[in-house]
């Protein structure tokens, strides 16, 4: 197994650690530690792709699992923030998009076609990760609340745009 694929697996293994930190309030500074774990996991998303492309280590496993790892990480964070920081209906829309695209990719994989993530999807994921970090930090400033809401709405818009783009480019 090459390094980019190991980074993808590491990102997936970070998810339960992140969730425990988000949900167990008895751990001192749990939100800050959770943000640290989330940032490290998110950075592996950038690293695995760059390393894979630079050293010609792109694999079908990576093309399939890298976006899935992103979906799992972001979805876990959204579920942890659901209701308290993000309205439930927005979380439902975002996770529904992720499930739809995962199903779409699975159908393609059954036919021997591996659909790589597109630019809009990568942009959406990056934006969602930034939004999640801002919301978890929960800095008690009005400007920070406004930034959080702006990020939520932009993430929702990018979720819809990226789904339309993905389906339009890959429907066969």
Predicted features along the sequence, with ranges:
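Alpha-helical transmembrane bundles and membrane-interface segments of multipass inner-membrane proteins
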Residues: 1-172
């Amino acid at each position: 197994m090459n390094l980019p694929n190991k980074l993808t697996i590491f990102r997936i293994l970070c998810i339960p650690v992140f969730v425990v930190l988000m949900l167990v309030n008895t751990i001192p500074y749990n939100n800050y530690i959770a943000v640290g774990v989330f940032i490290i996991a998110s950075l592996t998303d950038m690293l695995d792709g760059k390393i894979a492309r630079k050293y010609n280590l792109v694999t079908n496993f990576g093309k399939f699992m890298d976006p899935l790892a992103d979906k799992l990480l972001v979805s876990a964070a959204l579920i942890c923030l659901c209701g308290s920081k993000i309205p439930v209906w927005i979380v439902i829309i975002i996770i529904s998009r992720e499930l739809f695209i995962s199903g779409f990719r699975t159908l393609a994989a059954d036919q021997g076609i591996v659909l790589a993530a597109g630019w809009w999807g990568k942009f959406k994921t990056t934006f969602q990760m930034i939004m999640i970090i801002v919301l978890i930090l929960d800095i008690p400033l009005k400007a920070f609340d406004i930034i959080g809401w702006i990020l939520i709405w932009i993430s929702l818009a990018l979720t819809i745009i990226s789904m339309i783009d993905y389906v339009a480019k890959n429907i066969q």
